[in-house]
Amino acid sequence: MILEKAREILEEHQLCNHCLGRLFGKLGKGTNEERGRAIRLLLSMETGKEYKEPEKCELCGGVFNNLDKFAELCIKAAEGIEFETFWVGSRFPEEIEKKEEEIWRKFRVVSGEKITKEFNRELGKVIAVRYGKTPVKERPDVVFIVEPFSEKVELQVNPIYVAGRYRKLIRGIPQTPAPGFKESIATIICRAFKKHFHGKCIFKGAGREDVDVRMLGNGRPFVVEIKRPRKRKVNLKDIEEEINQSGKVEVLNLRFITPEEAERILTTRHRKVYEAIVYVKDGITKEEVEKVVKSLKNAEIKQRTPRRVLNSRADLVRVRKVYDVKGELIDDKHFKLRLVTDGGLYIKELISGDRGRTTPSVSEILGKEAWCEILDVLEVLDDVEGDN
């Protein structure tokens, strides 16, 4: 039945061995070219008629004879780009794909393989053998999109994702570039990444601290995306050392990650440990500090979006929890608070009350005006909110 169908097709169409074999591509093993050559030979033996391969195939135009040339075009397109893994895609003229489908319909072909699939696979084999690169479908370093009939190659360079944590050692630096500031956490970190990877750097932090707040302890999680990197073989320890020489920011635990891991890091809320120096206008006693500690421990805080961020945040009431509190009297107007809270709780407003928008607050508990003079984030805890 296969030979009869092949004979009928060859009576009407001038097909090369690749395109003939591809009509039966889902049957048996071996390449389409081998399959087509075998079918042609069997037909000749059975009928006594020679079924020679045409000089030019009416379907593919002979593109499979030029795979070495297309491989060279791909490597040339990637000149200066460091890569080890790749994948191949292709764009054939619409009329070619339609003609292939018409042959399938007319001769009731049910075991065929699309021309693009064979071309991508066979070109991938040539690139792998000639240039020592590895074809990988999931997250390759680069993707070659080949247009065989126009001999054009489009190069897609996939981004690199790196995760880590940063410590902010001094006050007065925003997390991302902002008017009135010469530098930011993002610019300090990205400067080193751009230098080593030779690509565009995008910094994203898992939450942020205010400009006047330090981030200490184990640091805040962040992700860097490097778009169109020209270098991939980079020692992340070298980047760590370079950033840490700034004296302003330190990074630790840099590691390569997947896009899915990046999404998880940036969307997971973690409990945080804060240390605040609180000023009480009308004075504070040791007993009042103990009252604050007792009132806030395990308290649920209803917090309306702080007035100072209303221009960039929706005006909503959010419920966050304070898990643990420790207090220490410093002098008659100052005391220290150490808090373990849900992520997303604004600590300055937890202290001031923000004109009643946060309740309970230190000001509300004391019945006195209080505000935060100094604030540090001591830790971003690894346990996810809600875990025991």
Swiss-Prot record:
Q: Where is the active site?
A: D210 (nucleophile)
Keywords for the protein's UniProt record, in alphabetical order: Isomerase, RNA-binding, tRNA processing
- Outline the temperature dependence of activity: Optimum temperature is 70 degrees Celsius.
Q: Which reaction does it catalyse?
A: uridine(54) in tRNA = pseudouridine(54) in tRNA; uridine(55) in tRNA = pseudouridine(55) in tRNA
Gene Ontology biological process: tRNA pseudouridine synthesis
What the entry lists under InterPro entries is as follows: PsdUridine_synth_cat_dom_sf (IPR020103), Pus10 (IPR005912), Pus10-like (IPR039894), Pus10-like_C (IPR048741), Pus10_THUMP_arc (IPR055174), THUMP_dom (IPR004114)
**Which of the seven top EC classes does this enzyme belong to?**
isomerase
Write down the EC number: 5.4.99.25
Q: Where is the THUMP domain?
A: 35-159
Q: What SUPFAM superfamilies does UniProt report for this protein, alphabetically?
A: Pseudouridine synthase
In this chain, substrate is annotated as bound at Y274, Y346
A molecular function annotated in GO for this UniProt entry is: pseudouridine synthase activity
**Protein family:** Belongs to the pseudouridine synthase Pus10 family.
Q: Quote the NCBIfam families the UniProt record gives.
A: pseudo_Pus10arc
The free-text function statement in the UniProt record for this protein reads: Responsible for synthesis of pseudouridine from uracil-54 and uracil-55 in the psi GC loop of transfer RNAs.
Protein name in UniProt: tRNA pseudouridine synthase Pus10
Q: Please name the source species.
A: Pyrococcus furiosus (strain ATCC 43587 / DSM 3638 / JCM 8422 / Vc1)
